[in-house]
Amino acid sequence: STPLVLRSITRHKGYVKGNGTLSYKDVVPIAGVIGDYGAIAVAKSSPFKNFKDVVDAYNKDPNSVKMAGGSVRGSMDHLIGALAFQAAGADPNAVAYIPYDAGGKALAGLLSGETQIISTGLGELMGARDQVRIIGITAPSRVSDAPDAPTLKEQGYDVQFVNWRGFFGPPGMSNSDKSKIAKMLGDVQKTPEWETVRARNAWVNIYNPEGKFVSFLEKQTEEMTALMKKLGVI
């Protein structure tokens, strides 16, 4: 059987930062499949009702706002929050970011009061909406699967960002196998079962097969390099 690897922008950033030994060029890009917008949320009991409330509290006392994320500094979780604070005029590197080793642990940190906000993927929060209030997402407009989640853009913070996930094959994979799997992934996205999973996680379909996926990855490398330099991560 042909082994496959599912990758996301989080893994891709290791190469962009220069601390990874492999990039998409070392494997065979098959297809990009979904996008997951970033989200900032607070506990339901939080006094923060929107992102402006967070910014106001931070400007008054920077030590009063700690941001949880389910991965290390420089990861997608960190970048989402950093971009939001930067758009609000704050120094993104001065915001206290508390990294946890999983999204669930970051959520637990938020709910326990260890942190005041969480920066993560929207899909990560969809199953916890009875416990958290989503106060900003990085989509260009509200998404139908989470209509009550306001965008950062509509609140005056022009932050648009989407994490992606795609499939890669091993070096030497034949073109016929690559095309066959790419077609299969495209067909899967047309099924009602896929739609159920997609809607549950508020993902967006970004099917990019083969050559289109390579072009997408080339553009992502350029954009992520510029973004991480801008934020001082690299």
Predicted regions and their residues:
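Glycine-/small-residue-rich active-site loops that bind phosphorylated ligands and cofactors
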Residues: 46, 73, 173-174, 205
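Residue-level signal for the nucleotide or nucleotide-sugar donor/cofactor binding architecture
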Residues: 49, 105, 147, 172-177, ...
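Short linear loop/turn motifs
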Residues: 95-100, 168-169, 211-216
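Nucleotide phosphate-binding site architecture
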Residues: 126, 168, 195
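Small-residue transmembrane helix packing/gating motifs
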Residues: 159-171, 179-180
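An extracytoplasmic/periplasmic, membrane-proximal ligand-sensing/linker region
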Residues: 175-234
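Conserved hydrophobic/amphipathic secondary-structure segments
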Residues: 1-165
